[in-house]
Structures are given as C-alpha cells and as structure tokens.
C-alpha cells in the first residue's frame, strides 16, 4: 500500500523574530525544511505535499521540483493546514505521514519505524510520541486503564492531572489517508486557541471505535520542534554531535568534537585529523590523512589527501593532494592549488591556478593568475590585476623565479625559467630564460648621512 507525506511549512514563526520563514532557518548547513524532507524521503512516499503560506515563494524554492505544494493563506491551526492538502490526496488509498517542517532532528529511521508500526498494528491513526522530563508546552498523550490512547490534550486545555503526564505528542502522525480527510470535516475551533486542532481527529476516531496507536521515540531529542532561537541553537548542538560522532565512527580524529563545526553534507575520508575550532561548510570534501589545524575555515571546497591546512580560510576552491596551506592564508573562490603546492604565511590567492610544487611562502597576493609548476614567489610579491574597472590576467610559466617584493602589472606573461629581480616592477612580458630588472639603479652618496638627524654627530 502506498505512503504519502504532508509537510507543514506555512507558519511565520513569530518567536524567531525574523523576516525569514521559520522552516528556512538553517541547522548544520541546510534549512530545517530540507532536514525534514530528507527524513521523509526514507519512507519513499508516492507523493509529497508541502503546505506553504508565509512567504510561500521562498519556501517553494527550497523543494521546487521535489514536492507538490498547497497554500494555507490563513494560519488557523494544524488541522486547517492539513485540510489544505486534501486537493492533492483526496480519495487515495494508503497511509499519510503528517509532520511539521520545524523538526530538523527527526530521523528517517524513526519515521520508517513509525510507518511500519502503524501498518503492522492496523491502526487508523498512529501518533509519534516521546517521553519528556519537562513536558510543559507539549500536548499530552492521554491513555485509558488498558494503555490505549484516548485523546491528545494541548497544554492550554489540559487539567491539573493531564499536565502531569510526561508522554508528549511530537506533532508527527500517520493516518489512513481517506479516514483522515473524512474526520477533518468534523473538527471545530471550540478550544483555548480558537484553532482547528489536528489532534481532535484522534478523539473522533476513538469515539467511532477505530484503532489509534502510539509509537514512542527512543531518543527524545528527535522530537524537538524549533520555535525560537534558543531551540534553534539546541538543534544545532544536537546535530553537530550527531555529525561529528558519525565521522569519528568512520575513522576521523577530532581533537575536540565539541568545538568543531561540520555541515551535514561535508565528506571526510578516514585518517583525517581535525583540531579544535575548525569549521567545514557546504559541500566540502576532505581527502584521507589530511590535517586541519586550529582555526581553519573551509567552504564548498575539495581538499586532497595528505594535505595540511594550518589556521587558514579556503572558499569554493580545490586543493590537490600533498599541498600545504597556511598559517593565516586565504584561498579565495575559483582557485586551484595543484599537487605539492605550498601557500604560506599571509598569502592570498584569488581566482588562480597554481601549478605543481609551486611555492609562495609569505606575504604574497596572487590574483587572476595562471601559474606553472615549480615556480617560486619571493616574499612581498603582488600581482596587480585591477585597474579600477577591469581585471587582467598574469601568466607565469614553469620554473620561473619571482624575486621578493616584485610587482607584476597585468596583463603580463613571464616565460619558462625566467627571473624577476627583487624589488622590480614588471610591466612588460618576460621571455623564457630571461632576467627582468625593473628598478632604479642604486646610488650611494658618500658622507651625506652625517647631516641627517639620526647621525651621532647631530645629537646634542
């Protein structure tokens, strides 16, 4: 029998105090909505329906092409939100999962277990529950003396006895699809919130003698719904621990996993060593036996095997195997450092390809350049690539030697085995095997220093 899914993503999230819809706030690199969608995908629904409302177009963009959408123009409660999905699911045979888009910690495994429990017990409705040490604010699961679920009571509607119950409603359910939409026609707004509660369909099913069950999560953390920035930080913390644990199990060494921040889509090979205060974001990939030291920050980049990145930033770039970067280097977008490259202290590379075994040890800027292999950059080298309106390219061939404090005025080509003298400003192309000197000849004025204030003879 087919499975379907309804993701509730219409709310504004007032307590987030944000212009961004609540479900679009990110946890470990992707939106909460994407986390939920990925978990839901594990049950392989025949159809996904996402209920959107506040800033609908922004929410639609996240799952465009992956889900059907339906609008909830007025936020009149969870029951009302599910009603909006009827046009997409009416009359279909099967089970429908209903889940909120602000529950980023739920796992696909738990949702699959929930579906299996529902089917195996032949329930009309199954509630995903959890046991909370502090259940305040949650809807409570009320059972009879036989342990059967009789109803769900919201916090504001719960009496003193019901408020003591620690089994809580996570806001995730599985329903017989046809019976869900039939029951929704019979709910009303006679409650403290004046809303259509989805939970009221549970009471309707019970009154009709239909079977309602509950499947309890093993891990309460999965039930977290994010309603404010405090809960968002909690979700980030839980997700970080999960991600780092998974990498450690797969052979990655963490100096301090509590101070290492890795997005959910990052890939790390075995035998990588990661020191504290490292951040890996986006689609970053790190090759085997690499070392990332304290303070390294890498975004959407590929790092080859056996590299060492020392306290440096790398953005949208590729670093091939055996390269070393840092400390205090900045590899800006669209750069490629080929095998064995060394980029050292206070070196910035932007939009450039650096050939094999090339070295730029310190205090250098390489921008919009094509650099061959075995090139050496002396300290203080600058590629001057921008004239205020346009950017120009510098091309440096294999085995060139760029003397310290060279200023290379692009567009410029430097040939194989060429050398620029230290302190030169190079404005013209340098042929292969040539030495380029672009500086004034030194003139010594003997005895002139005696008249200068620093000279001992001028001291009083």
From Swiss-Prot:
Q: Region (Linker) spans which residues?
A: 230-250
* Gene3D superfamilies named among the record's database cross-references: Hexapeptide repeat proteins, Spore Coat Polysaccharide Biosynthesis Protein SpsA, Chain A
One Gene Ontology term from the biological process aspect of the record: regulation of cell shape
Principal EC category: transferase
Record localization: Cytoplasm
The active site of this protein is located at 362 (proton acceptor)
Q: Name one GO molecular function term.
A: glucosamine-1-phosphate N-acetyltransferase activity
Protein residues bound to acetyl-CoA: 379, 385-386, 404, 422, 439
Enzyme Commission code: 2.7.7.23, 2.3.1.157
Recorded GO cellular component terms are: cytoplasm; membrane
Q: Name one Pfam family in it.
A: Hexapep
Under which pathway is this protein filed? Nucleotide-sugar biosynthesis; UDP-N-acetyl-alpha-D-glucosamine biosynthesis; N-acetyl-alpha-D-glucosamine 1-phosphate from alpha-D-glucosamine 6-phosphate (route II): step 2/2; Nucleotide-sugar biosynthesis; UDP-N-acetyl-alpha-D-glucosamine biosynthesis; UDP-N-acetyl-alpha-D-glucosamine from N-acetyl-alpha-D-glucosamine 1-phosphate: step 1/1; Bacterial outer membrane biogenesis; LPS lipid A biosynthesis
Catalytic reaction annotation: alpha-D-glucosamine 1-phosphate + acetyl-CoA = N-acetyl-alpha-D-glucosamine 1-phosphate + CoA + H(+); N-acetyl-alpha-D-glucosamine 1-phosphate + UTP + H(+) = UDP-N-acetyl-alpha-D-glucosamine + diphosphate
Subunit structure and binding partners: Homotrimer.
Purpose of the protein:
Catalyzes the last two sequential reactions in the de novo biosynthetic pathway for UDP-N-acetylglucosamine (UDP-GlcNAc). The C-terminal domain catalyzes the transfer of acetyl group from acetyl coenzyme A to glucosamine-1-phosphate (GlcN-1-P) to produce N-acetylglucosamine-1-phosphate (GlcNAc-1-P), which is converted into UDP-GlcNAc by the transfer of uridine 5-monophosphate (from uridine 5-triphosphate), a reaction catalyzed by the N-terminal domain.
Protein name according to UniProt: Bifunctional protein GlmU
> What species was this sequence derived from?
Streptococcus thermophilus (strain CNRZ 1066)
In the record, what lineage is assigned to the organism producing the protein? Bacteria, Bacillati, Bacillota, Bacilli, Lactobacillales
What gene does the UniProt entry assign to this protein? Answer: glmU
């Amino acid at each position: 029998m087919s499975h379907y899914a309804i993701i509730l993503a219409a709310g504004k999230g007032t307590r987030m105090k944000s212009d961004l819809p609540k479900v679009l706030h990110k946890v470990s690199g992707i939106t909460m909505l994407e986390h939920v969608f990925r978990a839901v995908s594990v049950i392989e629904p025949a159809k996904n329906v996402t209920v959107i409302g506040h800033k609908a177009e922004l929410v639609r963009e996240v799952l465009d092409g992956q889900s059907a959408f339906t609008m909830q123009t007025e936020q009149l409660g969870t029951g009302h939100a599910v009603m909006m999905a009827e046009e997409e699911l009416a009359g279909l045979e099967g089970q429908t999962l209903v889940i909120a888009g602000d529950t980023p910690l739920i796992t696909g495994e738990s949702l699959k277990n929930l579906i299996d429990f529902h089917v195996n017990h032949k329930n009309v409705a199954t509630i995903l529950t959890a046991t909370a040490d502090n259940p305040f604010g949650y809807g409570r699961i009320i059972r009879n003396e036989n342990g059967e679920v009789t109803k769900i009571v919201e916090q504001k509607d719960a009496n003193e006895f019901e408020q003591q119950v620690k089994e809580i409603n996570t806001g995730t359910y599985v329903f017989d699809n046809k019976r869900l939409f039939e029951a929704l026609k019979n709910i009303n707004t006679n409650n403290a919130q004046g809303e259509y509660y989805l939970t009221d369909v549970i009471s309707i099913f019970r009154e009709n003698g239909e079977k309602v069950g509950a499947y309890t999560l093993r891990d309460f953390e999965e039930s977290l719904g994010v309603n404010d920035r405090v809960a968002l930080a909690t979700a980030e913390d839980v997700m970080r621990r999960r991600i780092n644990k998974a990498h450690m199990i797969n052979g990655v060494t963490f100096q301090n996993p509590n101070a290492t921040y890795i997005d959910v889509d990052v890939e790390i090979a075995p035998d990588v060593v990661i020191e504290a205060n490292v951040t890996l974001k986006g689609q970053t990939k790190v090759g085997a036996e690499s070392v990332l030291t304290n303070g390294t920050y890498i975004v959407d980049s590929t790092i080859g095997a056996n590299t060492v990145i020392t306290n440096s930033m790398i953005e949208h770039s590729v670093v091939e195997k055996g390269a070393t970067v840092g400390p205090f280097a900045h590899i800006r977008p669209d750069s490629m450092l080929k095998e064995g490259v060394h980029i050292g202290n206070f070196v910035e590379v932007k939009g450039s390809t650096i050939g094999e075994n090339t070295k730029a040890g310190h205090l250098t800027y390489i921008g919009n350049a094509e650099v061959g292999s075995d090139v050496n950059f002396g300290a203080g080298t600058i590629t001057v690539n921008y004239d205020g309106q346009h950017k120009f390219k510098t091309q440096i061939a294999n085995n060139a030697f760029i003397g310290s404090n060279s200023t290379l005025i692009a567009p410029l080509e430097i040939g194989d085995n060429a050398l620029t003298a230290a302190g030169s400003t190079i404005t013209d192309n340098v042929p292969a095997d040539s030495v380029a000197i672009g500086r004034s000849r030194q003139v010594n004025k003997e005895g002139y220093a005696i008249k200068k204030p620093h000279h001992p003879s001028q001291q009083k």
